[in-house]
Amino acid sequence: MKHTLLKSVALLAASTAVLAACSNSDSSTSSSSAASESKELTIYIDQGYETYINDVKADFEKENDVTVKVKTGDALTGLDNLSLDNQSGSAPDVMMAPYDRVGSLGSEGQLSELTLADSSKTDDTTTALVTNDGKVYGSPAVIETLVLYYNKDLVSAAPKTFAELEELAKDSKYAFEGETGKTTAFLADWTNFYYTYGLLAGYGGYVFGDNGTNPEDIGLANDGAVKAIEYAKTWYEKWPQGLQDSTASNNLINTQFTEGKAAAIIEGPWKAASYKEAGVNYGVATIPTLPNGDNYAAFGGGKAWVVPTGSKNTELAQKFVDYLTSTDQQKALYDATNEIPANTEAREYAVSKNDELTTAVIDQFASAQPMPNISEMGSVWTPAGNMLFEAASGAKDAKTAATDAVKAITDEIAQKHSN
């Protein structure tokens, strides 16, 4: 009996040892598998960044013993699909997002919180662009803002003030064919709120109070904003009627400029390639000083690196984002794409290249204001655009147009965001 009991104990001990060994083996295999999975990162980007990422990823892969897989596609489509991709487990680890999408996606739980590395050398404007309710959801990569393009064959130097633009408008060589008394000397797409905001802000208007975070305080009908709208109306009295058509005005402006009929226009850096292709002998400068002596305070824009909440390795993704926003990699981004780096040290490098467009954007960005990145901003665009059209067309005076726009924005926010 004793022998049988000892034998049973021995067998039990042996079985336990075998099970433990199997368990340890399974655990080891599982850990090995997890480690293997954690050593791969997927980055989703527009095709225009593919060469840049492939050129710079090797050092990161070597230093971190990781493989960076590059997938290309339309960035906005990728962001639109992020909710489903996060849920299904198919979200990439790193993406690029326009600043105006970062805050809302973060507040919706689609983006992971990030830490801005000291090496990213961000400034107050770019930091604000990736921050929502005190939380950082992206790391600034690229900056953009509106600038002044001018035709060097028509004017010898960039106009410095709006008073100079007004003088150009008196020159008969800029008379618009088909509409007596109308000029194309200077053109701006001011029925598009993105383009108009710099004028309004330069006079003291604003979208939301508390640096764009308080949707209960809308500053588009204050005294400064109304004065700006009244000034815009003086230009619409000079411009062809087609400038009032928000669906066709941008095309009209660019056609007049590329055909050599407009001396100066307000546009973004993304238009430079098409002007070059059209053979325009253009220059680029900061937007002229407003009649009140202040700067045109356009929206600051651009793109940030973000990490979806569905990332399988957020820690390594954060590390890759830090790598991409470091000074050396931001210099490489500029060299590869000519897009202006958010990193302030890399910006200095970009300026040293003596490129007119780069210098103008960086100088203008100093006066730029962060576009509010709270979700309520989506309720602003249509009413604010209507505000300028109604004032420009004479349907309403400036004060009424502004007051009505603020009411429309307030009502829509209440409807969409009421608790």
What residue ranges belong to the model's regions?
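Extracytoplasmic/periplasmic solute-binding protein
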Residues: Y137-A141, L146, E166-I218, A262
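Hinge/lid segment of periplasmic solute-binding proteins
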Residues: Y99-L146, A157, F162-E166, E177-T180, ...
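Extracytoplasmic/periplasmic substrate-recognition and gating elements
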Residues: S156, E237, K276-N338
